[in-house]
Amino acid sequence: FATAAFHNSYYFHKDDNVITNKDEVCKNFEQLIEWQLKENHPKSWFRAFFNMGLINYIEGGRRMLPCEAGSANFFIEPYGDVYPCNGLEEKYWMKKMGNIRETPNFMTIWESEQAQQVRDMVRKCPKNCWMVGTASPVMHKYIKHPLKWAIANKLRSMQGKSACLDKCWYNVGQDPCQGDLREKF
C-alpha cells in the first residue's frame, strides 16, 4: 500500500486542505516508520524514508530531495492538458506543457519549448510536496541518501533504538529555492 498526506491541487478541486491534528498524524507516521524498519524487506525501509518525508511535509519543512516533475513524470488531466504533476496550485504557479488533444503526438509536447519552460519553473517551484509520484523517482535517482538513512535506521531498529528522523535537505545540485515555501510565501 502507499501512504499520502493531504495535498491541495487544481485536480483535486481543493485549495483549503489543512491537517488540524498534525501532532497526532506525525506520531502515527512515526509508529509506522518503526514498524517498517522492523521488516526484513529493504523495500519497507525505503517506505519508512518516504514516510519520514511525509512527516517533513506535514510539519512544513523543506522538501528533502528535489522535485523533477515534468522530467521524470507527468500528469494528463481529463481535458488533455499535460502538466508536470497533479499537485500544482494557482496561488504558486500553474502552467501546462501542452494539450494532447490539440497536439496528438506526445513527444511533440514533451520536447517543446513550452515543456522546457515548465521544467524550468519546476526547478524553482516553492511547494514542498511529497507525493509518491514525484518522490519515488528521485529516491531512486539519488539513492545514496535514502539508502544511507535506511541502513543506519535499520541497524538502530535492530538495536532496539528509535529511528533518527533527521528530515534533512539533501543538496544534490537543485535550486535552493525549490521546495521551500518559507523563503517566498
What do these predicted regions represent?
Residues 81-82, 86-185:
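Flexible mid-to-C-terminal extensions adjoining Fe-S/redox cofactors in radical SAM and related proteins
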Residues 1-69, 73, 77-78, 82-83, ...:
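Radical SAM enzyme [4Fe-4S]-AdoMet core and its adjacent flexible, acidic
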